[in-house]
Amino acid sequence: MRAEWNPSASLARYNALAIRTPQGWEITEPGKQHLRNLGVTKLSPAAVHVATDLRAELAKLKNDSTRLFVEEAIKCYEAELYRSAIVMSWLAAVDVLHNHVHQNHLAAFNAEAKRVDGRWRDANTTDDLGRMAEADFLDRIVAISVIGKNVKKELKDCLDRRNGCGHPNSLKIGANTVAHHIEILLLNVFELL
């Protein structure tokens, strides 16, 4: 005679991975991570590929604060915290752009910023670059040929998406949208600068 399988008894043996609640069994965060490690995920294959590509990029990032931002964005993405992944990946991209301009184009940037707005005080640090609105910053770095106008258009779309995700509202974001967002940043910011 065949013994019946008792799911509750099986799950109880994995008390760190699943817990019994009044509504039934729930997978804990460590349990979800364990399933992801086993390859069990709701993420599409394309989304898993993007996360893998991003992890490969971490080693290439020289700036520690940028690396921490990108790593946190990847963790948000893998944990299906999509709005957070959008915000964190955008912050990482802006950090890369600020560092690149500061190290390689600061004089040209300040000249262009003053040409457009005579009240602009010269930036001397990456933090000073943060005084400028991000959309205006993108306009200035196009004008001094750090990025092209088509890249700016894509980055502006990413900025708009970040702004939508960074504030409470009804916007819904899925894995594929986040994969697209991160891929644009990966190809046009992280890999190039």
Model-derived regions: residue spans:
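Amphipathic alpha-helical interface elements
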Residues: H34, L43-V142, V146, K153, ...
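Internal, Lys/Arg-enriched amphipathic helical interaction segments that engage polyanionic partners
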Residues: M1-L61, L185, L192
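Alpha-helix N-cap/helix-initiation sites
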Residues: E4, A85-I86, K172-A175
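Charge-enriched, short contiguous segments at helix-coil
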Residues: N15, R20-R36, A143-L193
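Residue-level recognition of short, structured coil/turn motifs
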Residues: M1-R2, H105, S170
